[in-house]
Amino acid sequence: MTDDRDAGGFPVSAGVLFGLGLGGFFDGIILHQVLQWHHMLTSAGYPPDSVRNFQINVMWDGLFHMSTYAFTAAGLYVLWRYSRRNHVRWSRKLLPGAMLVGFGAFNLIEGIIDHQILGIHHVNETVPREQWIYWDLGFLAWGAAMVVGGWYLLKRGQQETRLRTA
């Protein structure tokens, strides 16, 4: 992660935390609730085929959402604290870049740990089981692309901010 002191007056860690939170919100709201492709423990012995299993999954989905709120609140706190001590230099590239790094990191961490190592759920469990890996790999590729794109934006934003202040 980029050090906040080297970001040309912008707290990169705040943007990364916002991105981690938004990545979790996207996963939880879109994939768990709207599309209902999976829930937190659907591949860990709690398929949504009974009211009791559904209740367990909804509770774990809620705990998951609490963690995404925590990331978002931490990002807000870091931004607030930084802005009380320093002048924040806003950039069209720094905040989106940092958020993309965080969102992509969420996908990579969640995709590797929950989908591959623990196997507690997979991205799209509505397709035949032999196709789950393709959705999981696509999720990881999407996350990697966001990290790379976000890193590029961060570097460009830092260069532009330094030039403006020089």
PLM-predicted stretches and their roles:
Residues 76-102, 158-166:
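Cytoplasmic juxtamembrane regions at transmembrane-helix boundaries
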Residues 15-26, 67-76, 102-106, 143-148:
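Hydrophobic cores of alpha-helical transmembrane segments in multi-pass integral membrane proteins
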Residues 38-54:
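Perimembrane loop-to-helix junctions flanking transmembrane segments
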Residues 143-166:
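Terminal transmembrane helical module of multi-pass membrane proteins
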Residues 31-41, 111-132:
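Interfacial helix-loop-helix junctions of multi-pass membrane proteins
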Residues 1-6, 53:
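Cytosolic juxtamembrane amphipathic/interface segments immediately preceding
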Residues 53-74, 130-149:
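Membrane-interface loop-to-helix entry segments
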Residues 6-21, 87-105:
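Interfacial segments of alpha-helical transmembrane regions
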